Amino acid sequence: MSIMGLLSSEQLNQLKLVLDTLSKNQLIWLSGYLLGLVNSQTSTDIGVTASGVSAGLELKPDLIDNTIIVISASQTGNARNIAKQLYSDLVEAGLRAVLFSAGEYKFKKISEISLLIFITSTHGEGEPPEEALALYKYLFSEKALRMEKTSFIVLSLGDRSYEYFAKAGKDFDKRFEDLGANRLYDRVDLDVDFQSEVDKWKEKVVSLCKSKIVSIVSKDKCINIQNNIVFKKKNPVTSYCKEFPLIAYLLNRQKITSCNSLKDVHHLEFDISGSGLCYQPGDALGIWYENDYNLVYELLELLNLTGRESVQIKNQSMCLDEALVKYCDLTQNTPVVVKSIATISQDKILLNLLQNQNQLNSFCSTTPIVEMFYQISMTKQLSSQELIQILRPMRPRFYSIASAQSEVGEEIHITVSVVRYTINGRIRSGGASSYLVDRVQDHDEIRIFVESNDNFRLPKDPNVSIIMIGAGTGIAPFRSFMQQRALDKALGKNWLFFGNLKFTDDFLYQIEWKTYFKSGILNKIDTAWSRDQDYKVYVQDKLLSNGLELWDWIQKGAYIYVCGDAKYMARDVEQALVTVVSIHGNMNMDQSNDFWNEMRVQHRYQRDIY
């Protein structure tokens, strides 16, 4: 749609008269002001992405050469936020730039880009973020086109605590080069505490881009680009984020597994009254938790520290115990932590572990930090500041939102499975899950923010059918989906596949699902209970046994949604889906994999995995 199709001639003339009087900085300010107005109107038919440009944007061929394409591949929002910052800096520098998420960009056209800046995080065991999977598979296929005309820059985010640090970015970087693209700047790999390094990187990138693209955008060129923008509806956003969370309050917490269950799962409701916080089905809730004081003082005693020592964190002085409660990850051990402690302590157990990566990884996954100090001898006193520098910075935990805002109003719901296990007779718990279930009380304050997930959205057309596949707490977003579909009076059919341990103990939200089924809103439900018989039954088995009908739904346009564990459940479910299409769609396995990749591109196959 062109501007002429949106504004009358009189409106366009009045707008041009005003714009001609504005400086570049005034235009930049105005663009942000107008974006805010658009985002505050939920009923508008026109909107833009958070970057200020539209999704699905295609530039005319004569504009591509002098346009910087910024693509972000994000799992929890970090890469996307950096891309937005860079985009703003490029525009402020007078450069023509367009921002996309990896899921928005028509990846087969990537070889036509003149200047590409690619910013990605790493997910799981070195995989790219979910929204970048289709692009990743295309680039590493024989179908990928050469990229000789493309100059590129890659920024890769990761966590040095893990074996596959920044691997997704490294993979993209090497593949761009293998396809003939020209490196404009060496890849930069950043750890979890990245902001200061990001600022330096952005400054360098803007300088390089200004040198690469001599022509600075004029007002006329700005108008030409706007003529190519396709506007789309966008829901409102708020200013709450990881750095500036909302203070919410716990309204209700209810255990939703039986007392006999091997799992301890709870439904939590938070009060967000008056905050203006908005969310959609499919979004995630970020929660800043606090460590257990008992765990903190157990660790301090093992290290002969009092907790009253002064330490520096984020340029602030505070007592060590406060820093450990609020700013350090005490529950997840990592190879980097073990290596640091081994170097200082010279403990033989840890030094031997460093010689075998597999044994080191196994030790980290089974031995929490505090348990490690029970097992080793410290030949040197660890200082309070050394401890702070060794431990990973605390990061928020993310939970799939289990409510539709149009149903629950100024509340937000999540589903939490508490991590509990015993080591050497001592009970250990997960940091965030035990905080939410064991330590937070009704009406206590919780620091939260919404992480938008445009890669896990209901179909825009309510007449389209959906298939929901979840295991354990992976059922949470489907509760929000069904609340929304019921309110929308969606005519599309709904089919739920759900798996857990036992029917009598672990059927999460059972009454709600039965109510939806009896009312006809939920058309089909297939459950898999892995411990209810001598042999294991999982959701992927149910997919295979319902393969013919599943294929029929897919052929009729159904959207497929998967939520659950990334390492096992999501992998096995995808293999089952590939098998179903191969058998009932009369395809070989390669063709079936291509089919699901195309389903991803069409946003008909979406996953929320963790």
Curated annotation (Swiss-Prot):
| Pathway per the UniProt entry | Sulfur metabolism; hydrogen sulfide biosynthesis; hydrogen sulfide from sulfite (NADPH route): step 1/1
Q: Residue limits of the FAD-binding FR-type domain?
A: 243-459
Residues of the Flavodoxin-like domain: 68-206
Q: Which superkingdom does the taxonomy of this entry point to?
A: Bacteria
> What cellular component terms from Gene Ontology apply here?
cytosol
Per UniProt, FAD binds at: 331, 365, 397-400, 415-417, 421, 430-433, 610
Residues the entry annotates as binding FMN: 74-79, 121-124, 157-166
- InterPro entries attached to this UniProt entry: CysJ, CysJ-like_FAD-binding, CysJ_Proteobact, FAD-bd_FR_type, Flavdoxin-like, Flavodoxin/NO_synth, Flavoprot_Pyr_Nucl_cyt_Rdtase, Flavoprotein-like_sf
Give the reaction(s) catalysed. hydrogen sulfide + 3 NADP(+) + 3 H2O = sulfite + 3 NADPH + 4 H(+)
Q: Which residues bind NADP(+)?
A: S530, R531, K536, V537, Y538, V539, Q540, D572
Question: Which GO terms label this protein's molecular function in UniProt?
Answer: flavin adenine dinucleotide binding; FMN binding; sulfite reductase (NADPH) activity
Keyword terms, alphabetized: Amino-acid biosynthesis, Cysteine biosynthesis, Electron transport, FAD, Flavoprotein, FMN, NADP, Oxidoreductase, Transport
Protein EC? 1.8.1.2
Name the enzyme's class. Answer: oxidoreductase
Q: How many cofactor units bind, and how?
A: Binds 1 FAD per subunit.
The record's Gene Ontology biological-process terms are:
cysteine biosynthetic process; hydrogen sulfide biosynthetic process; sulfate assimilation
Per the entry, which co-factors are needed?
Answer: FAD; FMN
Q: Where is the signal peptide?
A: none
CDD domains on file: SiR
Fill in the subunit field for this protein.
Answer: Alpha(8)-beta(8). The alpha component is a flavoprotein, the beta component is a hemoprotein.
Q: Which family does it belong to?
A: Belongs to the NADPH-dependent sulphite reductase flavoprotein subunit CysJ family. In the N-terminal section; belongs to the flavodoxin family.
Summary of the function given for this chain in its UniProt record: Component of the sulfite reductase complex that catalyzes the 6-electron reduction of sulfite to sulfide. This is one of several activities required for the biosynthesis of L-cysteine from sulfate. The flavoprotein component catalyzes the electron flow from NADPH -> FAD -> FMN to the hemoprotein component.
Q: In its UniProt entry, what is this protein called?
A: Sulfite reductase [NADPH] flavoprotein alpha-component
Q: Which organism is it from?
A: Blochmanniella floridana
